[in-house]
């Protein structure tokens, strides 16, 4: 399964256009524009599984910086500041990584 099986390609494109400039990425805004915030819990778990590149059950900081590239190969890498802000917003237990439940909570909040 791919992200375009769950999210509309046009919504993904719009979300990526919105954050093309460095330091313009807002996770909440990306989730809204891409349509992620309207998806069911099971769909969000599948999205998380796709984004968890190493299939560790977590999205670590190294994976997070390539977040946009998981949606489109040519997308930019998140800046260090964007990556740290994204991680801090989602990592509720402070373990330095985002679990599936933390991801789902962030998307749906």
Swiss-Prot record:
Quote the tissue specificity entry: Restricted to the thymic stroma.
**Which residues belong to any copy of the EF-hand domain?**
39-74, 78-109
Q: Which Pfam families match?
A: EF-hand_7 (PF13499)
Locate the residues binding Ca(2+) 2. 91, 93, 95, 97, 102
Q: Which InterPro entries match?
A: EF-hand-dom_pair (IPR011992), EF_Hand_1_Ca_BS (IPR018247), EF_hand_dom (IPR002048), Parvalbumin (IPR008080)
Q: Name one GO cellular component term.
A: cytoplasm
MF terms from GO for this chain are:
calcium ion binding
The cysteines joined by S-S bonds are none
**Stored CDD domains:** EFh_parvalbumin_beta (cd16255)
PANTHER family this protein is in?
A: ONCOMODULIN-2-RELATED, PARVALBUMIN ALPHA
The protein's name = Parvalbumin, thymic CPV3
Its source organism is Gallus gallus (Chicken)
């Amino acid at each position: 399964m791919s992200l375009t099986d769950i999210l509309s390609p046009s919504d993904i494109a719009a979300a990526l256009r919105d954050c093309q400039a460095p330091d313009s990425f807002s996770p909440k805004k990306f989730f809204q524009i891409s349509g992620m915030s309207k998806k069911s819990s099971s769909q969000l778990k599948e999205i998380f599984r796709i984004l968890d590149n190493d299939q560790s059950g977590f999205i670590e900081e190294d994976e997070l910086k390539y977040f946009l590239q998981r949606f489109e190969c040519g997308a930019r890498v998140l800046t260090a500041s964007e990556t740290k802000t994204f991680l801090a917003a989602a990592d509720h237990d402070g373990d330095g990584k985002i679990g599936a439940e933390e991801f789902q909570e962030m998307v749906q909040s």
